[in-house]
C-alpha cells in the first residue's frame, strides 16, 4: 500500500490533494491512503472558525468546507489526528473518531484502526503538563483558557494506548516524543532551528508521554509534525522493554502484583497477527503545507490486497480497551489518577490489555468491523458568495452539539460520550443529536414540550400553555384576560391552577359541574373587584 504522509495540513486540502495527483502522474502510481499529522483545520463555517486558537488576523476558512458541503470529494481515503490549530468544537463531537466529511476520517482523542491489514494508531493534541492529569472538562462555547486546553493531551488516552498488544505499523502524533532528536542528525536539526537548543537542554522539546508510548508500542513507523521542519530518526528497541522498561518509566507503571496480573492476561490473550519483528521505529517529522517545504512523504507499507478502494475497519482490541476503561473517564477540571503503582494492597485492575472473553464480547457487538459510511451534515457550510467579507464580520462561537456518529458508536459499544458527560456534569441539557441549535438551558416540562409540538398555532402566552395542559377544550367563550382582570396566584398554585376571571352572570351547565377550587377562586376574585369598585 502506498501511503502519503502530510505534516501540518493547516486547512490546505486542495493543495495537498493536487500535490498527490502530481506525484501520481509523475510516478505513474496510485496513492491509496493519506495520513495527516494534525493542524487539519476542519472548519465547516464561520462559527467553527471562532473556536480555533489562533490570533484573529490568522483566521482563514481555507478549503475544508468544500469537502464538507459536497462541492468537492476527497480523491483518496484520508485519516487525520488533531493538533493545536483545529475546529475544536467539531472534533470534540467525535471523541472516538468519525467522518468529518465523505472519505475523511478523524481518529478521535486517540484511536486505532486498520486499513487493509495496516494497523494505524494515533493520538491528537499537544502535551502541556498542567493539563495532562485533568479530565476532558471543556465544552463550547469556549473561554480564552478552554479554547486552548481542549486540545491538550490527557493521561487517559496515553494510558489506553499503552494497553495495545501486538504490532502497530504506523503511529501518528502531532508532538514529537521527547529525546527523539538523539536518534537522528541533531546537528543538522539545530542548524535549521537553532532556537531548539535551549529546549533540548532543558528536556522541554517534545512530549514525555509520547516518549513512553514510543517505548511501549514500538511501531514500525512514527509520523509527526508541529515543529515545522523535516526530521528523520531511527529508534532501536530492546523488545524486553515492551512489557518492562517502558512500563517502569511510565507514571502508571506496574507493581509486582500488577506484573503477575499482566502475565495472566498475556497467557489468556489471543496470539497477535503474525508479523516480522520490529527492531527499530522509523521516525519522520514533516513540515507544513507551503511552497518549497518538505510537507509530504510517500511510503510503501505491506498490506492486504486492495480491491477497489481501501477498507477502513475498527480495531477489535482498541474497542475492547475503550469498553473496559470507560469507567476511567473524567470530565472534571481537577487532577485525578489512573490505576497503577501505589502504596498498600493492590485492589484495582490496572492492566486492560483485552482477554479473549473481552475481545469476543466486542466482536459480538460489532459483527462487521468495517467502519460504516454514516457521515451526516449537521450544520450549514460556509457560503463564500454571501460571506466573502467574513474577516470583518463579528461571529459568535457555536453552541454545543452532539454528533449522530458518536451517538451510534457509543450506543453500540456501550460506553459514554465524554461530551454528554461534561454537559450533564455542568447542569446543562443535552442538545438534540445532530441539531443545529442547542435546546433551552432552562428545564422545561416534558408535557409542555409535547403540547408545543402538537398545537398547530404557536402558543403565545404562559396562560394559554397552562390552559392547554390543565383543561379540556372550553365550552364557553374565552375570557378576557387583560392586566386589570388577572390576579397573581402563589407560585405553587400557579403551576397547577388556572388563572380565573370574573363571569358574574354565566351559570355553569348542569352536566359539567364546576370544581370547588374554581368556585372559590371566583368568589375571592369577585370580592376583590367589588372592594376596588367601592
UniProtKB/Swiss-Prot annotation:
Record GO biological process: mRNA splicing, via spliceosome; RNA processing; RNA splicing, via transesterification reactions
Disulfide pairings: none
GO cellular component, one term: nucleus
Residue segments, region Lariat recognition loop: 124-154
Its EC number(s): 3.1.4.-
Sample GO molecular function, one term: metal ion binding
Tree of life domain: Eukaryota
Keyword check for Translocase: no
Role: Cleaves the 2'-5' phosphodiester linkage at the branch point of lariat intron pre-mRNAs after splicing and converts them into linear molecules that are subsequently degraded. It thereby facilitates ribonucleotide turnover.
Record's protein name: Lariat debranching enzyme
Organism from which the protein derives: Drosophila melanogaster
Gene for this chain: ldbr
Amino acid at each position: 500500500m502506498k501511503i502519503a504522509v502530510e505534516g501540518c495540513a493547516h486547512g490546505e486540502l486542495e493543495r495537498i490533494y493536487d500535490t498527490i495527483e502530481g506525484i501520481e502522474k509523475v510516478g505513474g502510481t496510485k496513492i491509496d491512503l493519506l495520513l495527516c499529522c494534525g493542524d487539519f483545520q476542519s472548519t465547516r463555517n464561520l462559527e467553527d472558525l471562532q473556536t480555533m486558537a489562533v490570533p484573529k488576523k490568522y483566521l482563514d476558512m481555507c478549503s475544508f468546507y468544500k469537502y464538507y458541503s459536497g462541492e468537492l470529494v476527497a480523491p483518496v481515503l484520508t485519516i487525520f489526528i488533531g493538533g493545536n490549530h483545529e475546529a475544536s468544537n467539531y472534533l470534540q463531537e467525535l471523541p472516538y473518531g468519525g467522518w468529518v466529511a465523505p472519505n475523511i476520517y478523524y481518529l478521535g482523542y486517540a484511536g486505532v484502526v486498520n486499513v487493509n491489514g495496516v494497523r494505524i494508531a494515533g493520538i491528537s493534541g499537544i502535551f502541556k503538563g498542567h493539563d495532562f492529569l485533568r479530565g476532558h472538562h471543556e465544552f463550547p462555547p469556549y473561554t480564552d483558557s478552554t479554547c486552548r486546553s481542549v486540545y491538550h493531551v490527557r493521561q487517559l488516552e496515553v494510558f489506553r494506548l499503552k494497553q495495545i498488544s501486538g504490532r502497530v505499523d504506523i503511529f501518528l502524533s502531532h508532538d514529537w516524543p521527547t529525546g527523539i532528536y538523539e536518534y537522528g542528525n541533531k546537528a543538522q536539526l539545530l542548524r535549521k532551528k537553532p532556537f531548539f537548543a535551549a529546549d533540548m537542554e532543558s528536556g522541554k522539546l517534545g512530549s514525555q508521554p509520547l516518549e513512553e508510548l514510543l517505548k511501549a508500542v514500538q511501531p514500525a513507523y512514527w509520523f509527526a509534525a508541529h515543529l515545522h521542519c523535516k526530521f528523520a530518526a531511527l529508534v532501536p528497541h530492546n523488545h524486553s522493554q515492551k512489557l518492562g522498561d517502558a512500563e517502569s518509566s511510565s507514571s502508571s507503571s506496574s507493581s509486582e502484583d500488577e506484573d503477575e496480573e499482566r502475565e495472566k492476561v498475556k497467557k489468556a490473550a489471543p496470539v497477535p497477527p503474525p508479523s516480522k519483528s520490529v527492531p527499530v521505529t522509523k521516525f519522520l517529522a514533516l513540515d507544513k503545507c507551503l511552497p518549497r517545504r518538505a510537507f509530504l512523504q510517500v511510503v510503501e507499507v505491506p498490506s492486504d490486497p486492495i480491491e477497489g478502494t481501501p477498507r477502513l475497519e475498527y480495531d477489535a482490541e482498541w474497542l475492547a480497551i475503550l469498553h473496559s476503561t470507560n469507567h476511567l473517564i473524567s470530565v472534571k477540571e481537577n487532577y485525578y489518577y489512573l490505576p497503577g503503582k501505589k502504596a498498600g494492597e493492590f485492589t484495582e485492575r490496572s492492566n486492560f490489555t483485552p482477554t479473549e472473553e473481552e475481545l469476543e464480547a466486542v466482536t459480538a457487538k460489532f459483527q462487521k468491523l468495517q467502519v460504516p459510511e454514516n457521515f451526516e451534515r449537521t450544520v450549514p457550510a460556509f457560503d463564500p458568495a454571501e460571506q466573502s467579507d467574513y474577516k470583518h464580520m463579528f461571529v459568535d462561537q457555536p453552541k454545543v452539539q452532539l454528533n449522530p456518529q458518536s451517538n451510534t458508536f457509543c450506543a453500540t459499544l456501550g460506553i459514554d460520550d465524554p461530551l454528554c458527560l461534561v454537559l450533564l456534569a455542568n447542569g446543562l441539557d443535552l442538545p438534540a443529536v445532530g441539531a443545529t441549535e442547542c435546546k433551552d438551558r432552562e428545564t422545561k416540562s416534558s408535557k409542555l414540550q409535547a403540547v408545543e409540538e402538537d398545537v398547530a398555532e404557536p402558543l403565545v402566552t404562559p396562560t394559554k400553555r397552562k390552559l392547554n395542559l390543565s383543561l379540556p377544550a372550553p365550552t364557553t367563550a374565552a375570557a378576557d384576560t387583560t392586566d386589570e382582570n388577572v390576579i397573581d396566584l402563589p407560585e405553587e398554585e400557579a403551576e397547577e391552577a388556572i388563572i380565573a376571571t370574573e363571569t358574574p352572570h354565566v351559570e355553569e351547565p348542569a352536566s359539567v359541574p364546576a370544581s370547588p377550587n374554581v368556585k372559590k377562586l371566583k368568589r375571592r376574585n369577585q370580592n376583590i373587584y367589588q372592594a376596588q369598585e367601592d
